[in-house]
């Protein structure tokens, strides 16, 4: 057995973490020969619930789980970690504006960024799920200068999975036959699911689904509003699907990308090939090489419709950045 991989998870008593922790501990992500150490973070008043989750995980007797520790101090949770999965964040309450939510969560991600900076491995990879995840990720990044800026990601993999499902459903094929699905921009209602560059059975989407009106309206809006639809139907936000997408996002980053494919993740826009303003956490199509290096896929074409939508999501991210500019170290 190799040395254990240390993974920190914030929001450990929440529903996403509950759907995630057992799968991580089982070895699903890193395989049957890799030990795992889980370091789970929660706010003090949720530690009792988290203790119950810890007991359940212990009762599974996972052979690959080297240890599980729980705490309310990010400086303990993030010590010497290889990965941080930042799930915990304040949710939007009644009457709360997006600006209010950003301000509330900025405090959390300033603190967590500083803790990562102080005690995490400099090579640690950070995945932000807590919303608004793009700008929360930017805040954490700007408070962790000792970590590599290119190793901070906000999750748009759930949006990619949703888009993949809707395209497969419409074309009546398996989801495995849908590829090269890109989510551009923000993980919000302005996100842009790209049907122009996606493929179904290795063919351009529009040759299989020649209904431009459905693609421009029904498809895009269904992806953009899927989270809200789940809340309306279930009374709670996405949890198991978000956990599954987070595992997908980590797998995307860890393993080489198959030839001719790519995945979506939001990362720092500096030096991107599409003219998106720098200093944003923006979702792009990406690939990982055999040596583990991640790069943005270049050369994808935007038609006028796609370009207009992408400019809107870029503008929203610029506005979010401005809302928290007073606490960003830029």
From Swiss-Prot:
Can you name the source organism? Protochlamydia amoebophila (strain UWE25)
Residues involved in NAD(+) binding: 11-17, 105, 112, 129-131
Give the catalytic activity: (S)-malate + NAD(+) = oxaloacetate + NADH + H(+)
Q: What is this protein called?
A: Malate dehydrogenase
Q: Does the keyword Secreted apply?
A: no
Which top EC class is given?
Answer: oxidoreductase
Pfam families of this UniProt entry? Ldh_1_C (PF02866), Ldh_1_N (PF00056)
Q: Which family would the database say this protein is a member of?
A: Belongs to the LDH/MDH superfamily. MDH type 2 family.
InterPro entries recorded for this chain?
L-lactate/malate_DH, Lactate/malate_DH_C, Lactate/malate_DH_N, Lactate_DH/Glyco_Ohase_4_C, Malate_DH_AS, Malate_DH_type2, NAD(P)-bd_dom_sf
Quote the PANTHER family the UniProt record gives. Answer: MALATE DEHYDROGENASE
Q: Name one GO biological process term.
A: malate metabolic process
Q: What is its EC number?
A: 1.1.1.37
Q: Name one GO molecular function term.
A: L-malate dehydrogenase (NAD+) activity
State the function annotated in the UniProt record. Answer: Catalyzes the reversible oxidation of malate to oxaloacetate.
State which gene encodes it.
mdh
Residues annotated to bind substrate: 92, 98, 131, 162
The record, for SUPFAM superfamilies, names: LDH C-terminal domain-like (SSF56327), NAD(P)-binding Rossmann-fold domains (SSF51735)
Record keywords: NAD, Oxidoreductase, Tricarboxylic acid cycle
What is the top-level taxon of the source organism? Bacteria
Active-site positions, per UniProt?
Answer: 187 (proton acceptor)
